[in-house]
């Protein structure tokens, strides 16, 4: 099971046709005027969720999330659980795990599980705030839509560590590749990588560079021009 070279183009096509990714003039929480907008609240149809899960599965089934130097030559995952932080990470972790299972022809992914957290701990039944596989003693990859200020990621790491798990990787759908603020030259993904350490890969399925390079003039010359200008003005130094 290896990454499809076309998964980025395929996903971008779905995101644009379903207006998950749109172009225009948008004011972000940071106050910046962005020429594009990405919202995962629209990831709720079967074709779109499948395209998203397929792209994520392509990344997670490739290095650095798998080990290729195995005795039988079969790539094997470096993690035990895909963790989706509530709420947007929940459909992602389940859909991506399902896609990995569908693709698997070797059994290498048979023991990989999903898990997510409740915002409020359950006081009855099994109790607690974790749904899915127990995290204790397990290696965890966190999957989410984006990293903005890093607050949600830090909370997810805290939950996992409190439950006795170890974060070994992070995958997000989009890296905007822009500086967090005027005092921080790195992007949100870059900051997360710095904070978690070089041994914990933080990767994105798509980036602003992918949008520019793979779509080009298909999004219109003016939109392309504005994207390049935005990157030149706010681009991060990794």
Swiss-Prot record:
The keyword Repressor does not apply. It is an enzyme of class 2 (transferase). InterPro entries: OPRT, Or_phspho_trans_dom, PRibTrfase_dom, PRTase-like. Its EC number is 2.4.2.10. Pfam families: Pribosyltran (PF00156). GO terms for cellular component: cytoplasm. Orotate binds at residues 37-38, 148, 176. Keywords: Glycosyltransferase, Pyrimidine biosynthesis, Transferase. Pathway: Pyrimidine metabolism; UMP biosynthesis via de novo pathway; UMP from orotate: step 1/2. The keyword Protease does not apply. 5-phospho-alpha-D-ribose 1-diphosphate binds at residues 29, 87-88, 118-119, 122, 124, 144-152. One of its GO terms (molecular function) is orotate phosphoribosyltransferase activity. It catalyses: orotidine 5'-phosphate + diphosphate = orotate + 5-phospho-alpha-D-ribose 1-diphosphate. GO terms for biological process: 'de novo' pyrimidine nucleobase biosynthetic process; 'de novo' UMP biosynthetic process; pyrimidine ribonucleoside biosynthetic process. Belongs to the purine/pyrimidine phosphoribosyltransferase family. PyrE subfamily. HAMAP family: PyrE. Catalyzes the transfer of a ribosyl phosphate group from 5-phosphoribose 1-diphosphate to orotate, leading to the formation of orotidine monophosphate (OMP). Homodimer. This is Orotate phosphoribosyltransferase.
